Amino acid sequence: MDALAPTLTILGTAQDGGVPQAGCGCSNCIAAFENSERARFPVSLGISDNEGGMHLIEATRALPEQLKIWANACGLDSPVRPDSVLLTHAHLGHIEGIGQFGKEAMGCQDLTLVASDSVISILEKRNLMRPFVRADYTSNGTPKLEQGGVRFDFIPVPHRDDSSDTHAIIISGEKKRVLFLPDHDDWEQTLESVGYSNPNDWFQALGATHVLLDATFWNGDELSGRDMTEVPHPTVEDTLARVQNGTLRGPEIILIHLNHTNPLNNPDSPQSRMIEVAGHSIGRRGWRIEL
């Protein structure tokens, strides 16, 4: 892989709480405590551009480990210090590490931040904007960034907007185009908002070669004793029914944002086998896509 070729590195693949999750004794969490290979950090991506720029998507509580994973993938000795940070929304797991860029830890100054007005507002209210300078946006106010042969375009999607709005991000290089969709409420609302009747047509219209897709829950019975309508996400079962088989022509589907309860955390589960048979993948940290 060309050292200066724009490249995406997966730094985390779990829902906001990670795997293992605090206070949980489920089989997935116990397995992750006992075997670090079963552990998952909250969802995050690192993108290097062809000018040496480094762009972080999501700032999680696992930021120190993720910056070193990114460095290792890029052949660097020291942890990456990003040139920009992009945020899809303001739910806890996606911004929990944002304070580490401040004077208490990394001491960054004038670090470019790419996020929506409502996300910026949340950070300002929590006094977390001091290390950052807000990126210039397009005339309609939609966040975007273009640098070093890589372009980041934000797409609004419906998702529990109790603290901020939510965006997917299209990451485009010369060779590949990746849709990053870690969070949305359900396919009906999302497809209506983007103007398509099924995800396959939407992916094709975007020109996506890869889709990093919300796979929080396997089905609607996963959270025992909790009302799952309070944490809306499309189930993997529903997604599989809508997305064409991976052996057919279309983008590569990589499932991310797994809740700790999801049976896909167990590589030997029948559900994991179903994903393999369908021609899709369950994301792992350290995976790379040359853009």
Regions found by a protein language model. Give the residues of each.
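Active-site-proximal loop/helix segment associated with metal-binding centers of metalloenzymes
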Residues: 13, 17-47, 136-227
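Pre-active-site segment of Zn-dependent metallo-hydrolases
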Residues: 19-90, 96-105, 188-201
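Metal-dependent catalytic neighborhoods of phosphoester/phosphodiester hydrolases
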Residues: 96-106, 263-272
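Metallo-beta-lactamase
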Residues: 108-166, 174, 278-289
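Cap/insert and terminal regions of metallo-dependent hydrolase folds
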Residues: 177, 185-288
